[in-house]
Regions:
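N-terminal capping/lid subdomain adjacent to the active-site entrance of alpha/beta enzymes
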Residues: 1-174, 181-188, 192-196, 309-329
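Catalytic core of soluble alpha/beta enzymes
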Residues: 151, 156-285, 289-292, 300, ...
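Anaerobic metallocofactor- and corrinoid-dependent redox/one-carbon enzyme cores
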Residues: 296
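Residues that form or immediately flank small-molecule/cofactor binding pockets and catalytic motifs
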Residues: 10-12, 127, 228, 301-304
Length: 329
């Protein structure tokens, strides 16, 4: 039976202006993909990768090209064999997973062969701002039950930022996201001092094109690859430089490759973090599946939006609760 693919562009406003290392956003730019067999509809979602300079126009062009040639891409195997890892492929791949579940009358957990977990601990991201504003946001997050906070920090003010927040929140653990902006010298200076402040992970300290020196550096805090890591083929090299990898569906090009990446990372002794990219619960439902296999879960973007999709996942006390199969998968 032939399948039909449709897509639409949407913008979902954030609760407050969100500052990343590379940009500031008022809303999350997202694409929704529907794949239908005439009876069932599978849904998927993707965002934009600033690292790849993706724009709404470029992703729309990629989706339109896939739509026009969909007869040859209507299985996950064909899609992942033909289309490179990119955000557009993510939305289509996840829609095909959802459709497969609906046609088979089985859950994503059964189809993917992953044991269902009813809830998982997640962090919440504190965006770049003044130390006082970040401290206030961090205290508000802890008041809602979060015990693991992800702090985005430039090297020049990372110590001040983390010190200010840690002093106000004893016992809370932190992930520091450097977003490729540190030098090796700054990392060596900051890491021992951040360890004393209960920082448990440093994410992507060096630029992805200049992270080879990490192979010779024994960090007191585990280092996690983000921009350096997209697909399973990179794992043998990354295992020489990092202690963990951050999996994101837009980077892997969907759930299919994300599961392969998670397996490869574990086989090489790496820790796992599941991230997100401004998604609603529709984009983060497949992330939850991979997140159930991970040590850290940065699946919080739906909480940063002014509103989520109807029927989406709930977060209470720093725990993210599993989606219902009627919503996705």
């Amino acid at each position: 039976m032939s399948l039909e693919m449709m897509f639409a562009y949407q913008e979902w406003p954030y609760r407050q202006t969100f500052k990343f290392a590379r940009e500031t956003r008022e809303a999350a730019p997202l694409f929704v993909v529907h794949v239908s067999d005439g009876t069932h509809i599978g849904r998927g979602e993707c965002g934009l990768q600033s690292l790849k300079h993706e724009t709404p126009q470029s992703v729309a062009e990629q989706l339109r090209a896939m739509q026009n040639g969909f007869a040859g891409l209507s299985s996950r195997e064909a899609l992942n064999r033909t289309i490179p890892a990119q955000s557009a492929r993510n939305a289509v791949d996840c829609a095909l997973w959802d459709l497969e579940c609906k046609r088979a009358g089985k859950s994503i957990w059964e189809i993917a062969g992953v044991a269902r977990v009813a809830q998982i601990e997640v962090d919440i991201t504190i965006g770049i701002n003044s130390p006082d504003k970040m401290r206030a946001d961090a205290k508000a997050a802890v008041a809602r039950g979060y015990r693991l906070l992800k702090l985005k920090a430039h090297a020049q003010d990372a110590l001040e930022t983390v010190s200010t927040i840690a002093a106000a929140l004893p016992g809370v653990r932190f992930i520091v996201d450097a977003n490729e902006a540190w030098s090796l010298e700054q990392l060596k200076e900051l890491a021992p001092r951040l360890k004393a402040l209960n920082v448990v992970l440093i994410e992507q300290p060096l630029h992805h094109d200049n992270d080879a020196p990490l192979a010779d550096y024994d960090s007191p805090i585990p280092l996690c690859a983000d921009e350096s890591c997209a697909t399973a083929s990179q794992i043998p090299l990354l295992a020489q430089r990092y202690d963990a990898v951050n999996i994101k569906l837009d980077k892997t090009g969907g759930l299919t490759e994300a599961l392969a990446l998670a397996r490869a990372a574990r086989e090489h002794g790496l820790g796992l973090m599941m991230g997100c990219n401004g998604a609603t619960s529709l984009g983060n439902a497949p992330a939850y599946v991979v997140g159930s296999l991970c040590d850290y879960r940065d699946i919080d973007s739906q909480e940063l939006l002014f509103e989520d999709r109807a029927g989406g996942m709930a977060t209470r006390g720093g725990q993210l609760y599993a989606f219902d199969s009627a919503f996705w998968g």
